[in-house]
Design a protein with these regions (language model features):
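Active-site-proximal beta-strand elements of phosphoester/diester hydrolases
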Residues: 2-10, 106-118, 151
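N-terminal, active-site-proximal structural segment of metallo-dependent hydrolase catalytic domains
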Residues: 1-51, 67-71, 186
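Active-site beta-strand/loop signature of hydrolases that rely on acidic residues for catalysis
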Residues: 7-8, 24-42, 109, 138-160, ...
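Structured beta-strand-rich core segments of catalytic domains in phosphoester-bond hydrolases
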Residues: 38, 44-117
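Surface-exposed cleft-lining segments at the edges of enzyme active sites
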Residues: 89-90, 115-131, 167-172
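Internal catalytic-core helix/loop-beta-alpha segment
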Residues: 86, 92-93, 125-142
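Metal-dependent phosphoesterases centered on the DNase I-like endonuclease/exonuclease/phosphatase
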Residues: 52-59, 132-199
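Short catalytic/ligand-binding loop motif for oxyanion handling, primarily in non-cytosolic enzymes
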Residues: 13, 41-43, 69-70, 118-121, ...
Length: 199
């Protein structure tokens, strides 16, 4: 079975100091997608650039934000990609390193970090712009005809069951009706399937 794992690291260097690299090495994944790396590639040591797993090396492919110590995504893969895409053609979000994709031949894997929008009205407006533009990009992905996996920090709780205090969060970014409807549209109109497995 092909195994894809995803994590929001909240800083790859901090997570590595807390044992994340060893956990990732032991996890026996084919692909590991990470969000919020908060580091430039030049600042990563060799142990962070490639993970030595039980079946071989998972090479890291990185897309950091231009702003140091902020956002960024990466993908570690046991299998060499045929193509690598950094960004989805939207400068506002590509500058923040929010999308990286590898083409593995039979299918593609995407690591995605949706903005949270919680820090200010301006950032919430930016999140809504991201949502519209990413939905358009999903249509492009569908037209390509190649299966794909999106491993993401969506920064949206889709259903009431996904959030402990959903009633008190209905006016907060991350559980706004517009955000939940966006996730619903991606599933129903664009054909995305939502799956989550923990181990």
């Amino acid at each position: 079975m092909f195994r894809v794992t995803s994590f929001n690291l909240n800083g790859i260097r901090a997570a590595s100091r807390k044992g994340w690299l060893q956990w990732a090495a032991d996890h026996n994944a084919d692909v590991i997608c990470v969000q919020e790396i908060k580091a430039q590639e030049k600042d990563l040591d060799a142990s962070m650039r490639a993970i030595q797993g039980p079946r071989g090396e998972l090479k890291g492919y990185f897309f950091p934000a231009q702003k140091p110590g902020y956002a960024g995504t990466a993908i570690y893969s046991l299998h060499p990609p045929l193509e690598l895409f950094r960004g989805f053609g939207e400068a506002e979000f590509d500058d923040e390193g929010r999308y990286i994709e590898i083409d593995l031949g039979a299918f593609a894997v995407i690591s995605l970090y949706v903005p949270s929008g919680s820090s200010s009205e301006e950032r919430l407006a930016s999140k809504f712009r991201f949502m519209r533009r990413f939905e358009s990009h999903v249509k492009t992905l569908n037209h390509r005809g190649k299966p794909y996996v999106i491993a993401a920090d969506w920064n949206v709780a889709h259903r009431e069951i996904d959030l402990k205090n959903w009633r008190s969060n209905q006016r907060n970014p991350g559980f706004l009706p517009e955000e939940r409807q966006w996730i619903e549209a991606l599933i129903k109109e664009q054909g995305l399937r939502s799956e989550e497995h923990t181990s």
